[in-house]
């Protein structure tokens, strides 16, 4: 729920009669997808919107970080995700762009997913239960089991780890790429990988992500899975009657929040062949 000046509203009522904009260029998220030498590199970045209150455009830092990652991949496609992020971060730091962002990078081959995650973006592997390595999940009606790859990193509730720069303290108030969660997991043919900014996972439970994937697989596939997940996240973010994963976590932290969490949503989906 954004106005034309980029400011966000908590709910429809907060718009005071104004129409929310549909201009995707106002999103504070950034992403890229590059395939080099049979490896697919993907990154999603979530700019911190509160910079707008300080007169800083919160879109600039995540976009610069995303572009620097792409340039690094072009020069050194064999680097690991954490190495890519480290080089990109150093480049953006030299440019002294005010702002901050979470970051999630993946490198996916036919048999392996390598990741580097700093903050609260998320990545889930959706796997059919007859495939090796699938953990048992109870109470999930979907065909595929959601396997969480990287956990959130939070300083406090709703305060994720982030990379950034400020003209008052440089990079000191923020984390560095060395603070990121890194690792590798095996992937198998027909696995579906969903990576997204927190706008998805704050509003859509993992079980529901798997159910939407099921619906997509049994549909005519006119819409992409990423589009369907974005639509699901937006719908649930505007629902004041049903507590979202964000609202449930808020209440665990003694924060009174009900319903969904309006936010920018960026989703990238990959299917392993």
Pin down the residues of each PLM region.
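PP2C/PPM-type serine/threonine phosphatase catalytic domain
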Residues: 1-273
């Amino acid at each position: 729920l954004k106005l034309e000046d980029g400011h966000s509203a908590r709910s429809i009522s907060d718009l005071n009669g104004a129409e929310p904009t549909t201009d995707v260029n106002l999103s504070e998220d950034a992403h890229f997808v590059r395939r080099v030498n049979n490896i697919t590199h993907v990154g999603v970045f979530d700019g911190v919107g509160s910079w707008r209150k300080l007169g800083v455009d919160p879109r600039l830092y995540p976009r610069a970080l995303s572009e620097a990652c792409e340039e690094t991949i072009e020069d050194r496609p064999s680097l690991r995700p954490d190495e890519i992020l480290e080089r990109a971060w150093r480049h953006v730091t030299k440019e002294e762009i005010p702002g901050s962002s979470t970051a999630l990078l993946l490198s996916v081959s036919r048999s392996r997913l390598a990741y580097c995650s700093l903050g609260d973006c998320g990545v889930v592997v959706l796997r059919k239960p007859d495939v090796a390595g699938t953990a048992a999940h109870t109470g999930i009606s979907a065909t595929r089991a959601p396997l969480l790859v990287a956990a959130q990193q939070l300083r406090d509730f709703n305060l994720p780890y982030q990379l950034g720069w400020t003209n008052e303290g440089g990079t000191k108030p923020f984390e560095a790429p060395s603070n990121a969660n890194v690792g590798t997991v095996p992937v198998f043919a027909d696995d579906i990988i969903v990576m997204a900014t927190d706008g998805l996972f704050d509003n859509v439970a993992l079980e529901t992500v798997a159910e939407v994937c099921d619906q997509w697989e049994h549909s005519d596939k006119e819409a992409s899975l990423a589009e369907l997940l974005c639509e699901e996240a937006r719908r649930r973010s505007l629902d004041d009657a049903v507590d979202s994963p964000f609202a449930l976590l808020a209440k665990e932290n003694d924060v009174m929040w009900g319903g969904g969490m309006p936010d920018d949503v960026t989703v990238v989906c990959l299917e392993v062949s």
